[in-house]
Amino acid sequence: MQKRAIYPGTFDPITNGHIDIVTRATQMFDHVILAIAASPSKKPMFTLEERVALAQHATAHLGNVEVVGFSDLMANFARNQHATVLIRGLRAVADFEYEMQLAHMNRHLMPELESVFLMPSKEWSFISSSLVKEVARHQGDVTHFLPENVHQALMAKLA
């Protein structure tokens, strides 16, 4: 039986830190679903369709990754995808409290759903989509932090 994992997030936009996490997850699980949340309350810069397309291109080299947009409750989405593992990235101690709350809630809603926390490589440990967008808005060079297709899309959005 295949071990299916979900790596959810808003990915607005997907960064090299996200790519680092999903790449390592592909070595641990048979099938990884990169689940892109609609998250309208976060007022994303990119539409859900744009974020899905950007992530598909950025992960095309990873054969066991499927990119899917979703707007459902995570536990329901995981159940519908027949996934029993939820991948979450932890950049800093500050992330842990929030992620622990989410993990407990998801376990309450779907007891068989395990949360697995991965720390990004040191090179990406301070990167977030929000920070990258903020630096780019002020003409800072964010080339190093984004896949090339995402960098081009971000620069076009900000033009």
Curated annotation (Swiss-Prot):
One of its GO terms (cellular component) is cytoplasm. The record marks 18 as: Transition state stabilizer. Its cofactor is Mg(2+). Substrate binds at residues 10, 42, 74, 88. One of its GO terms (biological process) is coenzyme A biosynthetic process. Transmembrane segments: none annotated. It is an enzyme of class 2 (transferase). GO terms for molecular function: ATP binding; pantetheine-phosphate adenylyltransferase activity. The keyword Zinc does not apply. InterPro entries: Cyt_trans-like, PPAT, Rossmann-like_a/b/a_fold. The keyword Cytoplasm applies. Pathway: Cofactor biosynthesis; coenzyme A biosynthesis; CoA from (R)-pantothenate: step 4/5. Homohexamer. Reversibly transfers an adenylyl group from ATP to 4'-phosphopantetheine, yielding dephospho-CoA (dPCoA) and pyrophosphate. This is Phosphopantetheine adenylyltransferase.
